[in-house]
Amino acid sequence: VKKVLGVSLDELGISLINIRSTGFQNVAVLFHDDRIRKRCSIVTDLDMSIIDTTIIAGDTEDVKNRKKKYLGSQEKGIARKASLEMAFSGNPWISSFFASHTFEVDFVSAGNARKMLGILPDVYKDKATIATAKAELESADVALYGQRALTIANNYGKGCLAILLGKRIDPDVTIPEYILHAIAFAHPTVKKEVWFNVLDYRLKLLEDDLVTPLEECNEFRKKLTAFRNGEIDFVGVRNEMLSAFPGDRINDVLKVF
């Protein structure tokens, strides 16, 4: 988040709590009209299958077992979602946000395949395996890139994978949309000064990239100054950013607020 926004979750006023498995509800119940009156975003996986789980004639036992495994995870994910929605229905302080599959798969789906490609030499030593993994991660088929992402996470370890990916994160990373919505729910009102600092940070990156024409940067700098001075509002400067630099990753963030 800090690489993209220039400010961390802590600096936004958001605390990140890592809770395993079913522990969500035990902590989330604290956020209530009669308890802690602050917003809480629950972020977890829906675990939808990346393959067709229908067993057909001719499937080998290995294929059948693989399909059953994916189906089982999917059913647990659907049950998890239903349980969370039922538990906190009517509670305005809590909302749940789900990766369609898992974080690793959705991270690649969001457009971050290159980040995963960058860690392959750290995960595999065999050149043929690296080549196969590269082809799968670059595929548009979720069954291929999803399976490779899951294989890396399961074999290398999710914690170790997170550390490796963390070293590859840069300002051009695409934050998965479900995470952005979770951030926006937890912190729906961002002060103008914070937005100015975020956009100023992104503009400085553009000014230094040796690709973006400086006249375009200078023109947006005028709009940003007008925003700081109250001459245009957040929606106005958001639209100006999208118009001037449509490919900048900050637009992913701006559109959810």
Predicted stretch roles:
Residues 1-257:
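Acidic, divalent-metal-binding catalytic cores of TOPRIM
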